[in-house]
Amino acid sequence: MTRAAPAGARLRAARPWRGRSPAARLALACCLLLVVLTVLVVTRATQAVDQSVLDRLRPFDAWGEAQVGWSPWMDRLRPEHMYLLLGAVALGASLWRGSWWPAVLAVVLAGVSAGLALALKAAVHRTDPHGFVTDSGGAFPSGHTVALVVCLGGCLLVLRPRVRWWLWLLVPAAGALLTTSLLVAGAHWLTDVLGGALLGVALLAVGSRLRVRRLAHGVGGPTRRAGAAGP
């Protein structure tokens, strides 16, 4: 005779969505939205909206004062700079704490984000607003956006065991700056940026729950400073 499952377990089984952590819910929601958006992009259902935004922000494909003023931010916030920032912050945290786990966390976040972004770009193979397919494989999702969201958010995950809500405002603030520069310059479609943001947020939500993050903050395992070897 089998024992009946506790009431709490039965409730979680019946309502799996409610049994998940907020981070898991956020990751799942972003993944579902990304799948829907990808299908819409592939079927060109978003093309009219994308073209309307492009025509409004860069009419007649002209290069004017707005483009001159905003376009430098694309270079300042490009993926290489973002990944270098995350690497520098993680290396500093590793040296300060005497453990390589912060660096491992950064490598995981950077590697997975870059790999997934490139894979999705190659799968969708979308042209940019000027009709070209970039060397990275395509315009969707925006690699600039993925790198910015993951790396700025990753710095917070590396530095703080518990990130206060107002610190997260740094990510959308920088994201708004990058988005404006990408769209005004005509470097990306609007849905490219949205796709990059969804992928980046999903990866951050997952990364916040990884065991390697707990280890990076000395929770769940010894550090070198405590006399144990790192990874």
Tell where the protein language model's regions lie, with residue ranges.
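Hydrophobic alpha-helical transmembrane segments of integral membrane proteins
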Residues: V104-V133
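Interfacial segments of alpha-helical transmembrane regions
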Residues: R20-C31, L86-S113
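Alpha-helical transmembrane segments of polytopic integral membrane proteins
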Residues: D50, S113-A117, L152
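Membrane-embedded catalytic cores of phosphoryl/pyrophosphoryl-handling enzymes
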Residues: G131-P231
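N-terminal transmembrane-helix/juxtamembrane module of multi-pass inner/ER membrane proteins
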Residues: M1-M82, K121-F132
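Aromatic-anchored segments of alpha-helical transmembrane domains
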Residues: V35-T38, G111-A119, A173-G186
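Hydrophobic, membrane-inserted alpha-helices
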Residues: R12-A13, Q67, L84-G92, V150-G154, ...
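Structural signal for the C-terminal ends of transmembrane alpha-helices
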Residues: T2-R18, L91-W100, C155-R162, V206-V212
